[in-house]
Amino acid sequence: MNAATCNTTQEDSDSNQTSDITVNTVTEKGAWCWFADPRAVSHENESGTIKNSYIGYIDVQGNIKATQIDHLRNRMDEVLIRSWFQPDDHNNPTFLVLPDDRVMIFYSRHTDEPCFYYRISRKPGDITTLGKEIRLETADNTTYPSPFILSDDPDHIYLCWRGIGWHPTIARLTMPDKEDKVNFDWGPYQIVQSQKGGRGVRPYAKYMSNGKDRIYLAYTTTHPDNQSVNYIYFNYIDINTHELKDIKGQKLAEVGNGILHNVEATADYKNSYPVAVAEDSPYRNWLWEISVTDEKRPVIAVVRISEDKNSHEYYQVRWTGTEWRKTFLSHAGGHFHQTPDLEKCYSGGMAIDKADPSIIYGSVPVEGKHGSVYELKKFAVTPEGTLASTEQLTYNSHKNNIRPFVISNEGANPQMVWMNGDYYDWIVSSARPGYSTAIRTNMDIPSDEIDIDKGLLHQNPGGTASSVDLKVIDIPQSDKFTIHATIAVDHDAYYGEIIKTDAFVYGLKGGEQPKPYIKAGDNEMTSSNVLGNSDAWKTQNRGTGGHWHAPVKPESFQLTITYEDGVLRIYIDGLVDQYAEAEGLSLSQVVPGGFKGTMQNIRIYNRALSQGEIKTLWQLHDSTITSQ
C-alpha cells in the first residue's frame, strides 16, 4: 500500500533553516507584487459555516492561482484561476468577499490592456467553484486592482487601481447580477494628479478602507527611480460626498468633477497642504502598506532609498493627531534580488500587523550559515514613537524571504505569507527567467491522508491509448469515481474527445485558444482556461507591449476527473480547473482516446481522490503545462 501524510514544509526543501515561527509551504511556484491588494484575505461568516483563508499568486508560466485553506474542515485546495496570462508578478489576483459570502477575484495585465478580468465563486466561500471569466472594459490601461465594499453603500463595489494617465483611479461598480456581470455606474475617475501629469509621472498608491464610508490612500509623487526626492502623501475619499480630503478633513478636491488636486514634491506644496504630506525626507521614498485599524492614528510602512539606490531604510510613519511622526526601524540593505543594476528600489519588503499597527514585519539581510540572506524580522514601536523591540523570525535560510503580507490575526498570532527563493525580474523574458519563488506561511497547513491504492479499480501504468486504439475499460458500477491519466495531444491536431464514458465526455476544443470541456447529458461546460502556458514570453524582449503570444501547448499534462455528491471536478496538473454540477451520474465504462495523441498511466477509482492524492499522482510523472 502506498500511504502517507501530505504536508510540505519549508524544512523539506531547506532542511537547515530554523525559525521562531512555523514555516510551511503554500506553493513552490508563486509570486506577487505589493500594490495589488488584498493579495490574501481571511473570511469567517456570521453563521460560523465558513472560516477560510485565500492566498493568490502568479507563476512564471503565466498561471494565476490561489490556495484556499478551510480552517473548519482542515482542507486545502489550489485553484487555477487563469492559465496563459502575461507572466508578470504585477498580475497577482486580489480578493473581495461579497455580501452573500461568494468570493470575487480580480486580476489584470501589467498596464498594457484597458480592462480587468474577474471570476466569482458559485458557492459561498468556496473558490474551487469559480464561475466563468468575465472581462470588464475600461477606457485606459489598468494595473493593481484593489476592491472594497463599505457599509454606507452596501449595494456597490468600489474599485481602485492605477489607471487614467498612470495615476490613482477609482470607480463604483454595481453588484454582480445573475450572470455575474457588473457595470460601472460612477467613474472611472482619476483621484489625484501629480506634477501636473507630466510625462513618465506615475504615483504608487496603497489603499485601505474603514469599512464604512472612507477609502484611505497613501501615494508617492512618482516612481522612486524617477526622482531623488519622492514625497509620500496621505488622503481619504468620502464615498458619500466623493470628496478627497486630508487627514484633518480639509477638502482637497471633489473626485469626478474634472478639477484634480495636484501634488508636488516641493516646499511650496507642503506649506500649502502641510498634513497632506506624510513623508518629505530627501530620499527616493516608497511605501509598502498603510493601516487605518486606528483611524485616528493611521500608519504607513515606508522605505527611504538613497540617491544611489544602494541603501534602503525602513520607517514607521504614524499620524499623532497633529503631525506625521517617523520612527526608524532597520537598515534594509539594498535591492534584494539576483539581478544587478535592475529595479534597485526593490526592497525586501514590509507588512503591517492587521490587529496592531505598532507592529511591522520586515525583510532584511542577515548574515547566517548561507551568507547574507533576507530574513523576516518583527519590529514593535511604542505609542511615543520609539523602537521598543526587534525580533528575528527566520534564521539560516538558503533563499531570501521577501514581500511579507499579514492576512489576519488569530489571537496574538498573525496569519502571514511571504515569498521565498530566487528572483531575477518582475516579468519573464528572453533576458531573465522572472520570479522563481515559492510562497511560505506561518499557518498550519492541512494534511491529506494519502493512499493512492485505496479504491483502485483499474491501472495501466505502461499502457497507451490513441485515436486508433479505443479499448473499452469496464469497471464495477460506481456513483463515486476518479479517472486519472497522462495525456499527450498531437500539437498539429490539438482537439477532440479525450475520454468518453457512460457518465460524461471530456474533450478539447480546437482553435487559437484551445480550451477543455466536459459534457454530462445535455449540459456542456467549457473551461475558462486555455490548455497551454505562457512560455512563449521566454523568447520575447522584456516589456509590457500588450501582446498575447500564442499559448505553448504542453508535451503532456496530468488529467484527473473526480465525481462525488453530484459534482464533477476537473484537475489539470493537480490544480482545480473546472467545477460542474451533474446529479445522478454513475460510471461503469470508460473509453480512452478519440483524439490524435496518447494516454498513459490510466488509473480509475471507486472514490473521489483528495487534491493531495491527485498531486501525489501528478508528481509521479513529468508534466509541462503548470510546471517548469
Residue ranges of model-derived segments:
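Beta-strand-rich interaction surfaces with strong enrichment in secreted/lumenal proteins
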Residues: 82-83, 93, 277, 470-474, ...
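Extracellular glycan-recognition modules
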Residues: 451, 463-532, 567-568, 604-617
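Flexible glycan-contacting loops in extracellular carbohydrate-active proteins
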Residues: 576-600
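Short, aromatic/His-centered strand-loop micro-motif at the edge of beta-sheets
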Residues: 519-558
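Localized edge beta-strand/strand-to-loop motifs within extracellular or lumenal beta-rich domains
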Residues: 555-569
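Extended recognition patches within non-cytosolic domains
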Residues: 450-461, 575, 601-628
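Extracellular carbohydrate recognition
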Residues: 225-231, 569-571, 591-599, 611
